[in-house]
Design a protein with these regions (language model features):
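C-terminal beta-strand-rich structural cap/linker in extracellular carbohydrate-active enzymes
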Residues: 708-735
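Conserved, mostly hydrophobic/aromatic
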Residues: 18, 167, 293, 339, ...
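Carbohydrate-binding surface patches
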Residues: 238, 247, 649-692
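Catalytic cores of secreted or luminal carbohydrate-active enzymes
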Residues: 596-647
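Short Pro-Gly-centered flexible turn/kink motifs
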Residues: 104-109, 288-307, 726-733
Length: 735
């Protein structure tokens, strides 16, 4: 097994193919301490683990427990799951409040079990074994004073060098316990031998997941969201990098949260230069009441270590999510090339307009028409009708089935847009059920995009939302749903939750979303679901569990997408990124880019179109058959291959270059985008990655044959392209 318990020194060894994670139970108090996480250590029976790495000894001006030297000074000890209020002043993993108002908890080792496979987390998205078997360690911990117990759950995915972590807390006492903070994972590292950086992904609407690296300084640094979703602004990810780490060298520790709501991810450099990383639900506005016998399951953290820089971390996450998070028939299936009518028509459409787009699309190699916002109620703008999921027959005379049948007759699939979590004040649903809105009694509610948020913590609200959406999907041959969420949560209050459970609303809302999507997929197992939230505000591993692709950003400009997609590709397989060729001037910022470049950039994702193909220039329209053929030619490679970053436009401000190489190293596709042209500039040298040095490769465009070692070490030359925003694809196959 990949997990072993060594009785002689009470250590736990968790191994993957290239990494080891070691913990130890120490002292009479049975503290669980972190020993090591990094490159794989060879275990030899009878040889003790390097428990000397755990900090011990006196810490001046710090309280101690029982005056013992070993771990009595908690403020310097590498705790595996630290509590609060008892002398460890660093970031805690769990904090509580008793009915008496007291704080303070320390969870100590009681027992453990090692099992084959991986238990599911109740009501939460989580990774699963798939074809690769897993081993799971469950540490049973207890705080005897409060009666709080914990199950620390560790699962090893050996082939992809990943360890997942989660926590289940339970109240065994007679009195209630209030959880005020629950982190899913804590990682204490002794990094006194060198300096480290942290890497996070920041952004806003229209420019999500921008990579940002900074030096780790003393104190706490991190990112989080209190918006009710993972957000445009920050991403539920943090990485610790050795100061000299590059794209392909150096140490990287990554933590990624399988959750779609409020989160907090932090790294803390202590007074002793040790580092504590924590990740979990954001404690702001979070209080969870546990009655006797009740449990709370925390969402999962996907943790990995790479000694091969960011590329190593990226490959671990890509392989992990492809095989162990994404579900359903579309996980391994080519996605249809779709055209979405949003940027083509916005709310101004009818059956005739949609059929004209569909007719043209069917001639160009496009495979599905998606009807976006505006098809229901009396919705001609964004001020009305959310919640009234019934067809507007003034726009679609004869109803939805007639339109879908006509589109299907042209050889196209049909998809549709919903926003099931929202409600318009001007809607029949709101007039009938104003109490279904998340709101604070006595306070005028806040609107965003002219809408309120439905209280999905309530079963009757979830049932109504599901039944409304399901009725539409049953009414016609609808094979795709775009699930949108166009505002964040505020005015937090639920008329159903008692006073001492109002702090549970944020999390209960997210659980409600998960339940809805799970029910939808169970009812419609062949449905292709694409999640969206004002673009990429809920692009996270939690959503990926339900939908194999997520709309990457509402900014479809090819040049802005280079930065957005670079940050996204750092963690997510390319097949998960919703990416479309859109119109120019671009609707988000007015930039004009060549149609060819728009196609090349969108090819890195799911690939589709978001424009009125009946009105675009003929020169552009004539390129679409070649682009759709390009998608089919390279799709298997892009969906299954290894992604390599060669150059970053975010860093150099001039050009972007990345490639995908097949797992067997027999094929590769290089994408090169010249953002800004330069006068009197010679060819640019580009060194490829991920090839076999022994293989010889033919460059399809020129017929030239070069060795893999030559292409990776000496590189290839790319001549300057004429003009800004120009691009080139370079296809290589084994000669």
């Amino acid at each position: 097994m990949a997990i072993r318990y060594i009785e002689q020194d009470r250590t736990f060894w968790l191994d993957t193919e290239h990494t080891s994670y070691i913990m130890a139970v120490v002292d009479e108090e049975n503290f669980v301490g972190h020993v090591y996480y990094g490159q794989k250590l060879q275990y030899t029976e009878g040889t003790p683990a390097p428990v000397y790495l755990m900090r011990t000894g006196e810490a001046p001006f710090v309280p101690s427990q029982n005056n013992r030297e070993r771990v009595s000074f908690l403020d310097s000890f590498p705790m595996e799951y630290p509590g609060n209020g008892l002398g460890d002043y660093r970031e805690s993993a769990v904090s509580i409040r008793t009915v008496g108002g007291h704080v303070g908890v320390q969870l100590n080792y009681v027992s453990h079990e090692i099992v084959k496979g991986k238990p599911a987390l109740p009501g939460l998205p989580s990774t699963f074994p798939g074809e690769e078997d897993c081993d799971t360690l469950i540490l049973h911990l207890e705080d005897q004073t409060t009666g709080l117990t914990a199950e620390l759950i560790y699962t090893t995915f050996e082939k992809v060098d990943v360890i997942t972590r989660s926590v289940i807390l339970k109240n065994t006492a007679e009195q209630p316990i209030y959880l005020t903070k629950v982190m899913s994972a804590c990682l204490d590292l002794d990094c006194t031998d060198e300096k480290y950086d942290i890497l996070t992904l920041h952004g806003s609407w229209g420019r999500e997941r921008q990579m940002e690296r900074r030096s780790l300084m003393h104190g706490k640094q991190g990112v989080g969201s209190v918006r009710g979703e993972s957000s445009h602004q920050e991403h539920p990810f943090i990485a610790l990098l050795s100061e000299n780490a590059t794209q392909d060298t150096g140490e990287v520790y990554g933590m990624h949260f399988v959750y779609s709501g409020n989160f907090l991810a932090q790294a803390e450099l202590s007074q002793f230069d040790s580092i504590r990383m924590t990740m979990g639900i954001h404690p702001e506005n979070f209080v969870w009441k546990l009655e006797q016998g009740e449990s709370f399951a925390a969402p999962e953290v996907v943790m990995t270590y790479s000694s091969e820089g960011l590329s190593g971390m990226t490959h671990h996450y890509h392989d992990m999510y492809r095989e162990h998070l994404i579900r359903g028939e579309y996980r391994d299936k080519k996605r249809p090339i779709l055209i979405n009518n949003w940027e083509a028509t916005y709310f101004d459409f009818n059956t005739d307009k949609l059929l004209k787009i569909a007719k043209q699309a069917s001639k160009l190699g496009i495979e599905m028409l998606v009807m976006d916002d505006g098809w229901f109620g009396h919705r001609n703008d964004d001020s009305t009708s959310l919640g009234d999921w019934k067809v507007n027959e003034q726009k679609l005379p004869g109803g939805l089935k007639l339109l879908v049948d006509q589109v299907n007759a042209m050889g196209l699939k049909f998809g549709i847009w919903f926003e099931p979590e929202m409600i318009s004040p001007d809607s029949d649903l709101y007039r009938e059920h104003p109490d279904w809105v998340i709101s604070i009694p006595g306070r005028v509610g806040s609107l965003c995009r002219n809408q309120y948020v439905l209280d999905l913590s309530r079963k009757e609200v979830r049932d109504h939302a599901f039944e409304s959406v399901a009725a539409v999907l049953h009414s016609a041959n609808i094979e795709y749903v775009k699930w949108d969420m166009n505002r964040q949560l505020s005015d937090l209050g639920s008329v159903e939750l008692p006073v001492d459970r109002q702090g549970e609303l944020y999390h209960r809302y997210v659980l409600g979303v998960y339940e809805l999507q799970e029910r939808l997929l169970a009812e419609f197992p062949h449905l292709l679901l694409e999640n969206c939230s004002g673009g990429g505000a809920r692009f996270d591993p939690g959503m990926l569990y339900y939908s194999p692709q997520i709309w990457c950003s509402d900014d479809t400009d090819a040049i802005e997408r280079l930065k957005i997609q670079e940050g996204t590709m750092l963690l997510y397989p390319l097949s998960t990124m919703g990416a479309h060729v859109s119109d120019c001037p671009n609707h988000a910022l007015g930039r004009v880019t060549p149609f060819e470049t728009r196609g090349h950039v969108a090819l890195a994702g799911t690939f589709g179109y978001e424009l009125d193909i009946t009105k675009i220039p003929e020169e552009d329209r004539q390129q679409i058959p070649a682009q759709t053929a390009m998608y089919h030619k390279y799709n298997d490679l892009i969906r299954r291959g290894d992604y390599w970053r060669i150059a970053s436009y975010l860093e150099n401000g001039s050009y972007d270059c990345y490639m995908v190489a097949s797992k067997d190293k027999k094929e590769a596709l290089v994408t090169y985008v010249q953002v800004l042209s330069r006068p009197n500039f010679h060819s640019r040298r580009v060194r490829l990655k991920g090839l076999s040095p022994e293989n010889r490769y033919r460059i399809e465009e020129t017929g030239e044959v070069l060795g893999g070692d030559v292409l990776m070490q000496a590189g290839m030359l790319i001549a300057p392209l004429w003009g800004d925003y120009r691009s080139r694809l370079i296809h290589l196959t084994e000669a």
